[in-house]
């Protein structure tokens, strides 16, 4: 079900889900890879990063660390420091060639993949084939589109780039006025803060509504658009 209300010229809506639960391992970490490059939009990756980093699953292990199920790392074309929006400098953890397998892949808006688009596409195709879920935030959907990962699927992106996306990727079923769109293995969110909603949905799919709600509460995040 989609609910919305007018906010100026922009519709604020909940998400659309065509996806079921994800199976979490009984023990061990769920690796989460964040694909970043120059001009990566900070909130697009920092929002989901804080969500996954803040998940606590009571009774999952004997120690506090064991109850924190996600292990996070960044992947980039090289290990040279990148400059994200606002001048934030980040030293990537891995290159495409050296990155370990990930069960969750997060692709934020960014502007530094132009010269590395073939490498990024190759890595995304290989990594997403092994992952449980690949998610984009904002115009990160264009990266998934270029890789062919959205062909024949429903998707969304940043509201100011919807028309451009529709022209570039006519094979994708574009949805407007929604916070996110979930398919079984590929999901996309609208811009900026919508990535937090989609990340919470990933938590919900792995560990259920109670854990996801507790995560949102601990973040003091009052948005409810992730609940579908």
Enumerate the language-model features and the residues they cover.
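Phosphate-binding/catalytic loops
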Residues: 182-186, 203
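Short, glycine-/small-residue-rich phosphate/pyrophosphate-handling segment
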Residues: 151-164
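Extended, subdomain-level signal for the structured scaffold at the beginning of enzyme domains
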Residues: 1-134, 142-146, 163-168, 174-177, ...
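Alpha-helix boundary/capping and short turn/kink residues
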Residues: 155, 192, 205-209
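Conserved N-terminal glycine/acidic-rich loop preference
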Residues: 186-188, 192-195, 224
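Structural detector of well-ordered beta-strand residues that form the stable sheet scaffold
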Residues: 134-135, 156, 175, 187
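Short active-site oxyanion
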Residues: 129-133, 150-154, 185
């Amino acid at each position: 079900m989609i609910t919305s209300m007018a906010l100026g010229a922009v519709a604020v809506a909940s998400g659309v889900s065509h996806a079921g639960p994800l199976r979490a391992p009984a023990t061990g970490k769920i690796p989460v890879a964040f694909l970043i490059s120059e001009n990566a939009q900070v909130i697009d990756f920092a929002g989901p990063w804080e969500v996954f980093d803040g998940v606590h699953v009571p009774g999952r292990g004997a120690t506090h660390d064991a109850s924190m199920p996600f292990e996070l790392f960044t992947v980039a074309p090289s290990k040279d420091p990148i400059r994200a929006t606002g001048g934030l400098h980040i030293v990537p953890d891995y290159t495409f060639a050296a990155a370990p397998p990930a069960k969750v892949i997060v692709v934020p808006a960014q502007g530094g993949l132009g010269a590395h688009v073939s490498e990024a596409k190759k890595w995304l195709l290989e990594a997403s084939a092994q992952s449980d879920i690949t998610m984009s935030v904002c115009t990160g959907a264009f990266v998934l589109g270029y890789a062919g990962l959205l062909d024949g699927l429903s998707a969304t992106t940043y509201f100011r780039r919807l028309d451009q996306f529709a022209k570039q990727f006519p094979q994708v079923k574009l949805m407007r006025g929604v916070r996110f769109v979930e398919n079984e293995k590929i999901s996309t969110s609208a811009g900026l803060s919508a990535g937090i909603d989609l990340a919470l949905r990933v938590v919900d799919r792995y560990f259920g509504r109670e854990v996801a709600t507790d995560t949102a509460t601990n973040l003091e995040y009052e948005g409810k658009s992730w609940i579908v």
